[in-house]
Amino acid sequence: MSEPIENLTVDAVLEAVGLFCPEPVMMLHQKVRDLPAGGLLKVIATDPSTRRDIPKFCVFLGHELVAEQAEEGTFLYWIRKKPD
Protein backbone atom coordinates (compact mmCIF):
# COMPACT_ATOMS: atom_id res chain seq x y z
CA MET A 1 0.00 0.00 0.00
CA SER A 2 1.40 3.37 -0.99
CA GLU A 3 0.06 5.53 1.83
CA PRO A 4 -0.63 4.98 5.53
CA ILE A 5 -4.11 3.79 6.48
CA GLU A 6 -4.71 6.95 8.51
CA ASN A 7 -4.38 9.03 5.34
CA LEU A 8 -6.98 7.10 3.34
CA THR A 9 -10.25 8.92 2.68
CA VAL A 10 -13.18 6.54 3.01
CA ASP A 11 -16.44 6.98 1.15
CA ALA A 12 -18.51 4.93 3.60
CA VAL A 13 -18.22 3.04 6.88
CA LEU A 14 -19.91 -0.24 7.75
CA GLU A 15 -20.21 -0.92 11.47
CA ALA A 16 -20.79 -4.62 12.05
CA VAL A 17 -19.80 -4.57 15.73
CA GLY A 18 -21.56 -7.28 17.74
CA LEU A 19 -22.85 -9.08 14.65
CA PHE A 20 -21.95 -12.66 13.78
CA CYS A 21 -21.66 -14.69 10.59
CA PRO A 22 -23.29 -14.35 8.13
CA GLU A 23 -24.56 -10.84 8.94
CA PRO A 24 -21.31 -8.86 8.47
CA VAL A 25 -20.73 -10.25 4.97
CA MET A 26 -24.39 -9.84 3.99
CA MET A 27 -24.26 -6.20 5.10
CA LEU A 28 -20.93 -5.75 3.33
CA HIS A 29 -22.40 -7.04 0.08
CA GLN A 30 -25.21 -4.46 0.23
CA LYS A 31 -22.93 -1.59 1.27
CA VAL A 32 -20.48 -2.29 -1.58
CA ARG A 33 -23.37 -2.22 -4.06
CA ASP A 34 -24.19 1.32 -2.91
CA LEU A 35 -20.60 2.56 -3.42
CA PRO A 36 -19.43 4.12 -6.66
CA ALA A 37 -16.80 2.19 -8.63
CA GLY A 38 -13.42 2.78 -6.99
CA GLY A 39 -15.08 3.86 -3.72
CA LEU A 40 -13.38 2.99 -0.44
CA LEU A 41 -15.31 1.30 2.36
CA LYS A 42 -14.09 0.88 5.93
CA VAL A 43 -15.56 -2.10 7.78
CA ILE A 44 -15.50 -2.37 11.58
CA ALA A 45 -16.33 -5.84 12.91
CA THR A 46 -15.91 -7.93 16.04
CA ASP A 47 -16.64 -11.39 14.64
CA PRO A 48 -13.31 -13.26 14.23
CA SER A 49 -14.73 -15.18 11.27
CA THR A 50 -14.56 -11.94 9.25
CA ARG A 51 -10.77 -12.48 9.08
CA ARG A 52 -11.53 -15.40 6.78
CA ASP A 53 -14.79 -14.28 5.18
CA ILE A 54 -14.02 -10.70 4.13
CA PRO A 55 -10.79 -11.48 2.22
CA LYS A 56 -12.61 -14.34 0.43
CA PHE A 57 -15.52 -12.00 -0.37
CA CYS A 58 -13.09 -9.54 -1.97
CA VAL A 59 -11.34 -12.20 -4.05
CA PHE A 60 -14.60 -13.79 -5.17
CA LEU A 61 -16.19 -10.50 -6.27
CA GLY A 62 -13.04 -8.78 -7.52
CA HIS A 63 -12.82 -5.98 -4.96
CA GLU A 64 -9.47 -4.88 -3.53
CA LEU A 65 -8.74 -5.50 0.15
CA VAL A 66 -6.55 -2.42 0.60
CA ALA A 67 -5.69 -3.05 4.26
CA GLU A 68 -6.78 -4.91 7.36
CA GLN A 69 -5.98 -4.50 11.05
CA ALA A 70 -6.86 -6.25 14.29
CA GLU A 71 -7.07 -4.18 17.48
CA GLU A 72 -8.12 -5.83 20.75
CA GLY A 73 -10.97 -7.91 19.35
CA THR A 74 -11.98 -5.40 16.69
CA PHE A 75 -11.22 -6.13 13.05
CA LEU A 76 -10.85 -3.29 10.56
CA TYR A 77 -10.92 -3.64 6.77
CA TRP A 78 -10.52 -1.12 3.96
CA ILE A 79 -12.10 -2.34 0.73
CA ARG A 80 -11.96 -0.61 -2.64
CA LYS A 81 -14.85 -1.42 -4.95
CA LYS A 82 -13.79 -2.78 -8.32
CA PRO A 83 -14.11 -0.57 -11.38
CA ASP A 84 -17.27 -1.06 -13.45
Curated annotation (Swiss-Prot):
Signal peptide start-end: none
CDD domains: SirA (cd03423)
Active-site residues, Swiss-Prot/TrEMBL: 21
Gene Ontology biological-process entries: tRNA wobble position uridine thiolation
Localization terms from the record: Cytoplasm
One Pfam family, short name: TusA
GO molecular function terms attached to this record: sulfur carrier activity
Keywords attached to this entry: Cytoplasm
Domain of life, per lineage: Bacteria
Record's keyword annotation contains Cytoplasm: yes
Main location: cytoplasm
Gene Ontology cellular-component annotations: cytoplasm
PANTHER family, sorted: SULFUR CARRIER PROTEIN TUSA, SULFUR CARRIER PROTEIN YEDF-RELATED
Job of this protein: Sulfur carrier protein which probably makes part of a sulfur-relay system.
Family the UniProt entry places it in: Belongs to the sulfur carrier protein TusA family.
Name this polypeptide is given: Sulfur carrier protein TusA
